[in-house]
Structure formats: structure tokens, C-alpha cells
């Protein structure tokens, strides 16, 4: 039994509304984002999300159900091969509506509807990793602070620190320079062998 849709009918008749939503969904899946009026974007959102849910299941029956609404086989293939698997871990909320400035000609409220391309699981994991890393560095920094306070007491006078630090710095730069020349020589020999 046909049931009426909520809200105002877009386009006048039910057949026009079905065709309008099918064309909007086709454009959305083809381009990833489209600019349309706000009421059309709000009507398209549940329509497109149901189609993406069918694509996530990926069975033949689901493909046929989507083909009833979207007639472009290339777009249906993109939906089932790329968009559906991309949202496999996500339970809804596949689209986002962003309001933009009104249309210049008739001042109609406009919006951009787009597919959400961020992975929420990975962003949450990255955030948790950063929080864990900052918690680990805080105790290490706290442990290093008492050691730094002990070291100046062990040495006698500022002149002893400066004189001992300079020769060590010169030794490290000399050893680094010798390492860099050693690594450069084998590459030159291998270049000579090739030619």
C-alpha cells in the first residue's frame, strides 16, 4: 500500500519526486558532493543512506533493489564496489549537509550534501594514541627533572662543565665527519663498478 511522505512534496507529483530523488542520489554517488536546495538535501539524506546500507550488504538482492531506484549501472557499480565497502564499519551517518549562501536569483536557501569521507575509528585510534603518548612522556619528563637537579651539584664550578663539554663536542663532530666520509666512499666505488 502506498504511503505518503512526510513534509512538502518536491516537484508536485509523487512520480516527479521519485525521479528527482533518484537523479540527486545518482549525482551524489557519482561526484561525492552536490549543491542543491536545503529541502532537497534534507529529503535526499535518508534516501541516499538507505541505498548505501543496501550497498554495504552487497548481495544480489540488494543490488537489484538499488537498480530499481538508480538506473545508471556505472554509478551502481561504484556504489557497491567503493562506497559500500568504505562505510562497512560505520553504522549510519554516511552523509553530511552543510548550509551555504542563498541562491542569487531567487534567494532560495542552498546546501551542500556530501559523503562523509573520514574514518571515525581511525581518527579515534589516532587520538587515543596521542593521549597515551603524552601520558608516557609526562612521567619521563618528571623523572628527568630530579636527575637534572642532581647533576649540577656533583660538578664543582661552572668552568669545569664548560671545559669538559667542549672536547666531547669536538670528538663527536669528528667521529660523525669520519662516518659520513666512510658512507660516501662505498657509493662512489659502486658507481665506478657500474660504468
Swiss-Prot record:
Keywords: Ribonucleoprotein, Ribosomal protein. InterPro entries: Ribosomal_bL17, Ribosomal_bL17_CS, Ribosomal_bL17_sf. Coiled coil: none annotated. Belongs to the bacterial ribosomal protein bL17 family. Gene3D superfamilies: Ribosomal protein L17 (3.90.1030.10). Residues 153-173, 183-195 have a biased composition (Acidic residues). Residues 136-152 have a biased composition (Low complexity). PANTHER family: LARGE RIBOSOMAL SUBUNIT PROTEIN BL17M (PTHR14413:SF16), RIBOSOMAL PROTEIN L17 (PTHR14413). Part of the 50S ribosomal subunit. Contacts protein L32. It holds the Pfam family Ribosomal_L17. One of its GO terms (biological process) is translation. The lineage of its organism: Bacteria, Bacillati, Actinomycetota, Actinomycetes, Mycobacteriales. It comes from the Bacteria. Residues 125-195 are annotated as: Disordered. NCBIfam families: L17. GO terms for molecular function: structural constituent of ribosome. This is Large ribosomal subunit protein bL17. GO terms for cellular component: cytosolic large ribosomal subunit.
